[in-house]
From Swiss-Prot:
The gene is deoD. The record marks R217 as: Important for catalytic activity. It catalyses: a purine D-ribonucleoside + phosphate = a purine nucleobase + alpha-D-ribose 1-phosphate; a purine 2'-deoxy-D-ribonucleoside + phosphate = a purine nucleobase + 2-deoxy-alpha-D-ribose 1-phosphate. This is Purine nucleoside phosphorylase DeoD-type. The keyword S-adenosyl-L-methionine does not apply.
C-alpha cells in the first residue's frame, strides 16, 4: 500500500495499462480481462487486475495531466514493480491526414515542461517509446486493419491553451496529436529502466474541429486497448 494506491503487495501485475479516466479503466478491465478484481479505489482512482490470454494485467487510471500520472506511475514502478506501462487514451489530431478514430502510436513526445523537467537543468531530454513495444503495436494494428500513424506527439501541460503560435509550430513540424501525459510516462520509464508506450485514439481534430460524440468514444476505443494488450505480450 502506498499513499495513493491501496493495493496489497502482489496485487499489481508487471504489465499495466493506464487510461486517464478511472471509469475507462473499469470499462476496459470488465471488457477485456478475465476475472478482473478491483485492487485500488483510493481517491476514486480505480485499478483492476485480471488476466488476458493467460497473462496477468493491471488496468489503472492515471488521472488527467502529467503531475497526476507521475504520482501513479512512480508508485506503480517503485513500490509495485511494474515493468511495462502503456498509456491508453485520447488525443487531438494536428495533421490533415490523421482522422477521427485513427490510432496514433507515440514514438516521441515534445513538451514545454514535465514534472521531471527540473532535474535536467539546461538539457532538453527527448522522451521516446520502447522500440519493442512500438514495433509490436504497429504490427498488431496492421493485423487488425486499424488505420495507424507512428510519429511524434505533443504532451501539453494545459488543456485550455491560449498560444495559437505554439499550435502552429507543432503542426508545421509534423506533430501528429496532442495529449497531456505521455512525455512524463516516457521520462519515468527511461529513468527506471522500464518499457513504455502511448497508444492513442483520435477523438478530436484541432484543424477541422470535428469530435467523436460522447456515446461513440467508448466503443471506438476498443481497438486501442486490444493493440496495447497484444503489444505488451508480443
Amino acid at each position: 500500500m502506498t499513499i495513493h494506491i491501496g493495493a496489497a503487495p502482489g496485487d499489481i501485475a508487471e504489465t499495466v495499462l493506464m487510461p486517464g479516466d478511472p471509469l475507462r479503466a473499469k470499462w476496459a478491465a470488465e471488457t477485456f480481462l478475465d476475472d478482473p478484481v478491483c485492487v485500488n479505489e483510493v481517491r476514486g482512482m480505480l485499478g483492476f487486475t485480471g488476466t488476458w490470454c493467460g497473462h496477468r494485467v493491471t488496468i489503472h487510471g492515471s488521472g488527467m495531466g502529467m503531475p497526476s500520472l507521475s504520482i501513479y506511475a512512480n508508485e506503480l514502478i517503485t513500490e509495485y514493480g511494474a515493468q511495462t506501462l502503456i498509456r491508453i487514451g485520447s488525443t487531438g489530431a494536428m495533421q490533415n491526414h490523421v482522422a477521427l478514430r485513427d490510432v496514433i502510436l507515440a514514438m516521441t513526445c515534445s513538451s514545454i515542461s514535465t514534472p521531471s523537467s527540473g532535474i535536467f537543468c539546461e538539457l532538453n531530454f527527448a522522451p521516446c517509446a520502447d522500440w519493442g513495444l512500438l514495433k509490436a503495436a504497429e504490427a498488431a494494428a496492421g493485423a487488425k486493419g486499424t488505420k495507424t500513424h507512428v510519429g511524434g506527439i505533443y504532451s501539453s501541460d494545459v488543456f485550455y491553451d491560449e498560444r495559437p503560435d505554439l499550435t502552429e509550430q507543432m503542426i508545421r513540424h509534423g506533430v501528429l496529436g496532442v495529449e497531456m501525459e505521455a512525455a512524463e510516462l516516457y521520462t519515468l520509464a527511461a529513468r527506471h529502466g522500464r518499457r513504455a508506450l502511448a497508444v492513442l485514439t483520435v477523438s478530436d481534430h484541432l484543424l477541422t474541429h470535428d469530435a467523436l460524440p460522447s456515446a461513440e468514444r467508448q466503443s471506438s476505443f476498443g481497438d486501442m486497448v486490444e493493440i496495447a494488450l497484444e503489444a505488451a505480450f508480443a
